[in-house]
Amino acid sequence: MSKRDYYEILEVSATASEGEIKKAYRKLAMRYHPDRNPDDEEAEDKFKEASEAYEVLSDAQKRQAYDQFGHAGVDGSAGQGGFGGGGFADFGDIFGDIFGGGFGGGHRGPQPGSDLQYELEVSLEDAVAGTTVDVRIPTKELCESCDGSGAEPGSDVQTCPTCQGIGQVRVQQGFFAVSRTCPNCHGTGKLVKTPCKTCRGEGYKHSSKTLSVKIPAGVDNGDRIRLQGEGEAGEPGAPHGDLYVRIRVKEHKIFQRDGNTLFCDMPLSFATATLGGTMDVPTLNGKANLKIPAGTQSGQRFKLAGKGVKSVRSSHVGDMIVEVHIETPVKLTSEQKELLKAFDESLQGKHHKQHSPKTHSFFDSVKAFFKGDDEDGGNDKKDGPWN
């Protein structure tokens, strides 16, 4: 049967939490529940589709396989044996036994192929600049020997007498009549007496193919690229599914990214921070010159306009934020230590407040705090730099 992307079905992002997935399923299940939509086959199909998506995405192991290989990674584990199967044991905490089975349907036509999912890891540089990557994906195509029928050429394919070719059987469950996958034909609606020797009755052959995927500039973690018609083959007369390539950007040694903004931490010498100057800053397009004003403090941030990431949806280019961190000198010579001591002593005079405004402001605040305690009969004064 046709299988859309499970995240798309539940209307959630690929990074959705377990709670968000459960909430999304509950919303869709309530909307399309057969009891609320009697004799509405489209609603029944959407209910089944949402239930199958939830079965996979609510299971950590199945979700991991799906994220890596798409529907091919969970074939045979999702939606098999009707919705009353073991994979739906946790549905009871959402709606109870009312969701014990699947619902459906009339006669089925040729079903489009399943969508495929592929996770592609790219560097930050390639994500920002854009690139083209060749990927090799597993897929399945119609068997050329039997044209997808699953039967040995020249043999007959019979309509399943149990479900009359529908692929599902109606079962009474409490007050509801529900549909389950036909146990005789396993949902195919047909019976093959002499299986095709090439595909062993599957109707498909498993293979792989290499595709060139164009990565647009500005893609980010979780973005998806759709390649229409590059999914699995459908039943005879039906189109292929689609291929969804999900982007995962590698961590960078220098830059961090938030949307279209890049962040970079840079070491700064004590002398440059005090006296001012310039420094070379790495960007994704080479070096940029950053002016450092005198008196720069550790943790101070500077903006390099237009040095960030281009938006994937517009011509806007983000900025880069540089945060400087002043390095403390180590392994000083005796002469250097004496010079630093002399420098420090020179700051302790009457102009101390002018040279070290933050330190002086801090001690003023502490002094005022203890004076307030004394006025309220609090602690005695203690010796300290604020006295």
Curated annotation (Swiss-Prot):
The record's section on Pfam families has: DnaJ, DnaJ_C, DnaJ_CXXCXGXG
Output the GO biological process annotations, alphabetical, semicolon-separated: chaperone cofactor-dependent protein refolding; DNA replication; protein refolding; response to heat
Taking every annotated instance into account, which residue ranges of this chain make up the domain J?
A: 5-70
**Where exactly are the zinc fingers annotated as CR-type?**
130-208
Annotated disulfide bonds = none
* Cofactor binding note: Binds 2 Zn(2+) ions per monomer.
Principal localisation? cytoplasm
Q: Annotated Gene Ontology MF terms?
A: ATP binding; heat shock protein binding; unfolded protein binding; zinc ion binding
Q: Which InterPro entries match?
A: DnaJ (IPR012724), DnaJ_C (IPR002939), DnaJ_domain (IPR001623), DnaJ_domain_CS (IPR018253), HSP40/DnaJ_pept-bd (IPR008971), HSP_DnaJ_Cys-rich_dom (IPR001305), HSP_DnaJ_Cys-rich_dom_sf (IPR036410), J_dom_sf (IPR036869)
Q: Which residues bind Zn(2+) 2?
A: C160, C163, C182, C185
Q: Which HAMAP family match?
A: DnaJ (MF_01152)
Q: What is known of its domains?
A: The J domain is necessary and sufficient to stimulate DnaK ATPase activity. Zinc center 1 plays an important role in the autonomous, DnaK-independent chaperone activity of DnaJ. Zinc center 2 is essential for interaction with DnaK and for DnaJ activity.
Q: How is the subunit organization of this protein annotated in UniProt?
A: Homodimer.
What is this protein's function? Participates actively in the response to hyperosmotic and heat shock by preventing the aggregation of stress-denatured proteins and by disaggregating proteins, also in an autonomous, DnaK-independent fashion. Unfolded proteins bind initially to DnaJ; upon interaction with the DnaJ-bound protein, DnaK hydrolyzes its bound ATP, resulting in the formation of a stable complex. GrpE releases ADP from DnaK; ATP binding to DnaK triggers the release of the substrate protein, thus completing the reaction cycle.
Instruction: Name the chain's protein.
Output: Chaperone protein DnaJ
Q: Which organism is it from?
A: Hydrogenovibrio crunogenus (strain DSM 25203 / XCL-2)
Query: What gene name is listed for this protein?
Result: dnaJ
